[in-house]
Regions:
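Acidic, carboxylate-rich catalytic segments that either coordinate divalent cations
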Residues: 346, 353, 357-383
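Bacterial N-terminal signal peptides
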Residues: 19-32
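Low-complexity, Ser/Thr/Pro/Gly-enriched N-terminal "stalk/linker" regions
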Residues: 41-91
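Solvent-exposed loop and edge beta-strand segments that line ligand/cofactor-binding
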Residues: 42-48, 83-100, 140-157, 198-211, ...
């Protein structure tokens, strides 16, 4: 680049960072205005302005091939290919799973705001990516012997969330995309049915392999699709893995690169699986200090020290996912349960801490955090 071009690019980045900073600060102001008497409702709303800002972040990344972090096992020299050749539908946004949930986010925003300013561009990108040809290549990739554990279970879960979003949309173009995606979604469902009966122990990490999260979105998909086999599997595995859990060591959280709370993501699964009488009993045994906001390490937002570091910025995602878990767990407890208020207040603190940093100006967080923010702001507590 010439000197003048470099200066122009720097000025553009500064202007973009300033505008996104102002936008996300407005989210903080909305959070501060939230009245505690409405604590069971979403503390922040997703309006058209917010939707546009989130959409622009995803649109910027979904067609961006590099930098790219492939989860690709080479069986030979012929397998060394560019990301767009390996994954013609989901090559952007740094990695496969972020691309998948970036597509989900755009669909969610398009369904909520069909006349969004970015709607035309959203449809153009989705139509270019979610073709039958592209998704056939994606499905064939899953058929490789070396790809058996590919994106298990985090990417699987988001793929089913994408399929669920498409399947529930009465839109002519959306129906074509849903049809194109169905063979890949069917493969992922089979992967769940084949793998989880063999996994004897849950993975309780705060990152991608987390078992509870993988089962959570699979449960949502299965219920929406009327898939009784997958529903039964998730319910049986959830009870097997987590049904007897008590006195969870939540004071050990967070891990330094977590974007899930192993404690809360497990409870968010169990409130789906257990009935309204059973879940409060399980939760009281599982996290007995919740009514007092204890342990404090779980109820206070995590601190992020460097948003240019792809591992440390995970903690912004942790604050967002903690917020959606706490809201939904609280909604699953009886009104008189003393843990509700502590969970709702902490959810607001976590949301406020994270939303201002979804657009940090660095791709380390910007390629994925907006999806977490949209899920938090658009998913109704208790769903």
């Amino acid at each position: 680049l010439g000197q003048n071009e470099a200066i122009t690019m720097k000025q553009t980045r500064r202007a973009y960072s300033l505008s996104t900073f102002v936008f996300f600060m407005s989210l903080l102001i909305l959070a501060a205005m939230h009245h505690p008497s409405h604590a069971s409702e979403p503390s922040l709303s997703l309006n058209r302005e917010h939707a546009s800002a989130f959409a622009r972040l995803a649109l910027k990344g979904l067609s961006r091939e590099y930098p790219n972090k492939p989860e690709h096992v080479l069986a030979g020299a012929a397998d060394l290919k560019a990301p767009v050749a390996l994954h013609p539908a989901f090559y952007g946004s740094y990695d496969w799973h972020s691309s998948v949930h970036g597509h989900w986010m755009l669909l969610r925003l398009l369904r909520l705001f069909p006349d969004l300013n970015e709607a035309g561009e959203i449809r153009r990108v989705l139509d270019a990516h979610l073709t039958a040809e592209n998704l056939a290549v994606e499905a064939a990739y899953f058929g490789r012997k070396e790809s058996k554990p590919f994106e298990r279970p985090y990417g699987w879960a988001w793929l089913l969330k994408l399929a669920q979003e498409l399947n529930g949309w009465d839109d002519a173009q959306g129906k074509v995309w849903a049809k194109n995606l169905r063979p890949l979604a069917d493969i992922v469902v089979v992967r769940y049915l084949e793998f989880f009966p063999k996994q004897n122990y849950p993975i309780r990490t705060g990152v991608h392999p987390n078992t509870a999260f993988g089962l959570t979105f699979a449960h949502d998909f299965a219920r929406a699709a009327g898939d009784s086999r997958l529903t039964a599997l998730v319910q049986e595995r959830a009870r097997f893995y987590f049904g007897a859990d008590a006195l969870v060591p939540a004071a050990w959280e967070p891990g330094g690169a977590d974007f899930f709370s192993p404690t809360l993501i497990e409870a968010d699964l169990m409130r789906r699986v257990l009935g309204p009488d059973e879940f409060p009993v399980w939760f009281a045994r599982f996290l007995p200090g919740a009514a007092k906001g204890e342990p404090k390490a779980l109820f206070q937002p995590a601190t992020v020290t460097d948003r240019t570091d792809p591992q440390l910025v995970h903690l912004d995602g942790l604050n967002l996912s903690r917020a959606w878990c706490m809201r939904s767990i609280a909604a699953a407890l009886p009104l008189q349960n003393p843990a509700r208020a502590a969970l709702e207040a902490s959810a607001d603190r976590h949301a406020t801490a994270a939303l201002a940093h979804v657009a940090s100006g660095d791709y380390a967080g910007e390629h994925w955090l907006a999806s977490f923010a949209v899920y938090l702001l658009s998913d109704r507590p208790g769903n």
